[in-house]
Amino acid sequence: HLQRRRQRQMCIRDRISIKSGNNILKNIDTKLFNPYSVIIEKNNWRVTDEGKEYAINENDFSFKIGKNKIQFHVVFNIIHGTPGEDGLIQKYFDRINIPYTGPNSNNARITFNKNECIVFAKNLGISCAKSIFISNNQDVDFNIFSAMQFPLFVKTNNSGSSFGVTKVKNKEQLKTNIENLIGLGNGVLVEETLNGVEVSVGLMEYKGEIKVFGITEIITENDFFDYEAKYLGKSNEITPAKIPNNISDNVKRCAKLIYENLRLSGFARIDFIIVNDIPFFLELNSIPGMSNESIFPKQVRLSNLKLKDLVSYMINNALNN
């Protein structure tokens, strides 16, 4: 059952990557660039162009149309999850010397590791939920959870976008879910539930400063803002969030602090929950959803900037650095 659920979630994530990619493709300025859509599946890397498909040569990330070899100068990375957000595709492009948008391999790896991200945020003085990390080779003594209050969240440690997240209400559910998840990734994270106002912040480095596009309040139909709420429309989103200015300023400050200190590049989305006026860090997406219905593009539409200009800036930034 767990494996089927993971496969279903991964299929949804793949579909979202394609929707995000199509929206980015639409917003690439063809007066400046000659773009192609590349789909990367496990054993099938291919270019799709005008209804035709061309195999990618993985040795140098080129492809052929007839006898004409086409070599990419830059990659706009819009793969959600692995290998786009965990540093793997970045390592590959580093090896073959093709520049790419978004964070480098090491920074992407940190953003995809929930526990490392939480430790990082705490070290910056940002509040986080009480949590316990369990490594794959650890013998779990369930007494370590006695100081934590149910309900708890059990999460695979290396996953984005609320994949592999379950809310548990008692010790039996906790034990079952930890046993199900251990070994599927690089550990399991158990967190206390926070009750408050959940918000999402879209931001990027733009022309020498970290630009925050807006704060969106998320009201989910589900028990929490899980992958269905994020990707299947089971949530209401209010942009800009109806929160007081002083709290809004603090959320922006925390988001900028994380972005800057992680040395991120390009689009990012950082989620917080506001409890008693204090923002608690939840998670970070270094490659946020970019379909037309996604939070980030909606925030951009309410700013004085155009997505096309931001995309051009990111491509030029990758080429020039």
Place the predicted regions along the sequence by residue.
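Conserved N-proximal alpha/beta basic substrate-recognition cap immediately N-terminal to
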Residues: 18-130
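Active-site nucleotide/adenylate-binding loops and adjacent lid/helix of ATP-dependent enzymes
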Residues: 5-6, 19, 65, 69, ...
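Single conserved hydrophobic/aromatic residue that forms the stacking wall/gate
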Residues: 1-8, 12
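Active-site "cap" helix and flanking loop/linker of ATP-utilizing ligase/carboxylase catalytic domains
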Residues: 217-268, 295-321
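Glycine-rich phosphate/pyrophosphate-binding beta-alpha loops
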Residues: 81, 162, 218-221, 285-298
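Conserved metal-phosphate-binding beta-hairpin within the catalytic cores
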Residues: 192, 201-203, 259-292, 300
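Phosphate-binding site of ATP-dependent enzymes
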Residues: 169-253, 273-274, 278-280
